[in-house]
Amino acid sequence: MALSASLHLRQSQSLVMTPQLMQSIQLLQMNHLELTQFIAQEIEKNPLLEVQSPSDEASTAERGDSGPQPEEAGSEIDEGAGEGDVYDSATSRSGERLSDGLDSDFANVFPDDTTPQRADAPELLGQWKSMPGASDGESYDLDDFVASRKTLREALIEQLPFALESGSHRLIAQYLIDQLDDAGYLHADLAETAQRLASASEDVTRVLDVLQQFDPPGVFARTLGECLGLQLRARNRLDPAMEALVGNLDLLARRDFASLKKICGVDEEDLIDMFAEIRKLDPKPGTSFETGSFETIIPDAVVRTAPDGGWLVELNPDALPRVLVNHEYFAEISRSCRKSSGEQIFLNECLQNANWLTRSLDQRARTIMKVASEIVRQQDAFLMHGVGHLRPLNLRTVADAIKMHESTVSRVTSNKYMLTPRGLYELKYFFTASIGSAENGDAHSAESVRHRIRTMVNQESADAVLSDDDIVDILKKAGVDIARRTVAKYREAMHIPSCVQRRREKRALARVG
């Protein structure tokens, strides 16, 4: 068969994952900290990007510019960009001029083009901003003027000159101090430490024995039993019976009191006294010291009560990055560059990337607003009455309601938080599995059922401990159709012991009390 060359025309459509589209998808699932770091990197690479400072916002407010009013949950949001958009209107117009030259259509990525809502929630945001580390820099917090507490490392180093005189021993001690975790436990291998410091193993062991006498008692322990033993020794309470107890903490965790009485050689009354002594100890002695900076969770959305009794859903302005495109700088540089030069090509690419980024951030804010509003509409009973009234909800229900893809909702709810009158919750918290009703009524959420189980266990007495079958019967009377194995699974997930172990523990605690 002879080979021949021919030319054929074929028309087809295919989905192409462009770099801009990948960036938009990544922005959706970033939390506030990741987004801030990403924007800082983009600003370093793109000279046309800038972040609006709080002083610029204040001057804008003095000129009379105002943002849009908050929308009530479940209400329609006006189409198009308004005067109170998060980003500069010039940026949006420039983005529209460049959209024809991009590989992807924004309508395919973000089907909705509604405007994000920005407003202040005085009550809830005031509570959140009063937390340490949540200040916006415009007001003073008395906590900022309080002297910071000592860290565990500083407290231990202060005790070194009074305990160790040898310079080599102090070097070993400083190395061991650096190996402590925040709880005060030592995870370093002594043989490896001796080899690394070119010291004798006996010297390392001798230094460790001295360090284990430092305050707070229990530091430099390698296990929980050793930590409790060090604290008991400091109280002069480490007798053979107590030493046997801390050496068999696994039996204590299983509530195997009969075996503990036999191993410790004590009667039930003495064992109860030993339990009371153990309860006074600190399993993490290092946590009482300053451990460094804490990462403050910044809510992406805020929910507060509306004047008419409904709910107002607002985006947290502190979580919205104010990224703008400097068109004046672009025009000034363009006048001094030839159109075909490499500098002009670089500027055009920077302008295109900057406009894409600002619009992607704008669409991210709008998407978060729509998802948060729908969650509030679906979980209205939770906001009014608490966890026991949390409804079963899945991603598809929210996606269908806001006419977006299920994967988009999943990305938006990852690592995003909403401040409600009942506390700060991750958006994923509101999505729970469904448990059927025993009387063909409304389904119950798994989280609300777990809350009921926890409440029943907390309210039981030592003489009336509920078994899994008893919990099933109570839930069925309340209209929850649930199997015994499901109750056992929920109980174990919440680290609730079995009824036999709870009965032993409650009776022991009743005698101690």
Curated annotation (Swiss-Prot):
Composition bias type Acidic residues, residue spans: 73-86
Region (Disordered) location: 52-137
Function: Sigma factors are initiation factors that promote the attachment of RNA polymerase to specific initiation sites and are then released. This sigma factor is responsible for the expression of the nitrogen fixation genes (nif operon), glnA and dctA for dicarboxylate transport. The open complex (sigma-54 and core RNA polymerase) serves as the receptor for receipt of the melting signal from the remotely bound activator proteins NifA, NtrC, or DctD for the expression of the regulated proteins.
GO biological process, one term: DNA-templated transcription initiation
Motif (RPON box): 483-491
A GO-annotated cellular component: DNA-directed RNA polymerase complex
Keywords: DNA-binding, DNA-directed RNA polymerase, Nitrogen fixation, Nucleotidyltransferase, Sigma factor, Transcription, Transcription regulation, Transferase
Organism: Rhizobium meliloti (Ensifer meliloti)
Family per similarity comment: Belongs to the sigma-54 factor family.
Residue spans binding DNA: 394-413
Gene: rpoN
Protein name per UniProt: RNA polymerase sigma-54 factor
One GO MF term: sigma factor activity
